[in-house]
Amino acid sequence: MISALDTLTPAQRDLLDRWLPGAELVLDRSELHRAGTTALVLSAGKDRFLVKTAAEGVRHIDRELAAFRSWLAPWTEAGRAPSLVEADREARIIVMTHLDGEPASTSAAIHDPEIYRQAGELLAVFHDQASVEDEDYEPELNERALAWLDGTGLDDDLVERLRTEITSWPTPTTVLVPTHGDWQPTSWVLDNGTLRVIDSGRFAFRPALYDLSRLSAQDFVRNDTFEKAFCEGYGSDPREPEAWHRLQVRDAISVAAWAHRTGHAEVAALSRDTLTALVP
């Protein structure tokens, strides 16, 4: 039988043998991560580690390594995120400590508003580390959204309404902070009621409100107490209405273009309905 370790490149395997001699495979968690990413739980002595590798062209490992090296300290020092053990950017491999806990996305505890309060609290600490002003952020995103429109498969009338609206938007200087980029239960584990972060592969500097996009679309609509608990933990609601509207429109256009390109009819229809509601 082929082991998950056999999927590693020779260079990755050589590094792993040097870093964790005699390590044994405990669990393959690759299905919880993005396409092109291998995630393996290994045991070495009394300790467990998570090893991530990425296929050529997959940028998530570069982002995660940048996060580890400069921005995850508030979480790692509190035991709320793994610590970096070893890494080789060229070989596209990272070794980190393994966090105990069950995936939050499949845990019954994810229905507890306390988990969302913790999520808000952790995110506020992360965002508060730094901020920069960027005059080009909004104009560049608008140009990208306009370029995507022709590949969405949307009705001409809706495309024209979207184009007209986007070109009318103001382009204010934007405050960017370190963001996680995929802040939702699939990026968390729960250990006896404590939320921990397991994946930072979409780290980048963005507006703070970006990290609420997935929660708002999926979790907050299920139960408004989750939203209230999150904002309590965060200390405020960073979703300034006009900026939030622009983000929602651009995100929906991006998803529509992806769905049209890949043939996901249901997602395409949902994106169309979302955009019709946003730009009636």
Q: Where are these predicted regions, by residue range?
A:
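Helix-rich C-terminal or lid/interface subdomains of diverse kinases
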Residues: R214-P280
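Juxta-kinase regulatory segment immediately upstream of eukaryotic protein kinase catalytic domains
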Residues: M1-L27
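A conserved alpha-helical element in kinase catalytic cores
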Residues: R48-T97, E102-F126, T225
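A short beta-turn/loop motif at secondary-structure boundaries
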Residues: S30-R34, E86-E90, L247-Q248
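Active-site acidic catalytic loop and adjacent metal/ATP-binding pocket
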Residues: H33-G45, L50-V51, I166-L212
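Protein kinase-like catalytic domain
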Residues: L72, L123, H127-S131, S216, ...
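A cross-family kinase active-site recognition segment
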Residues: P82-A87, H98-V159, T164, P170, ...
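Conserved protein kinase catalytic core
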Residues: V58, P103, W188, F205, ...
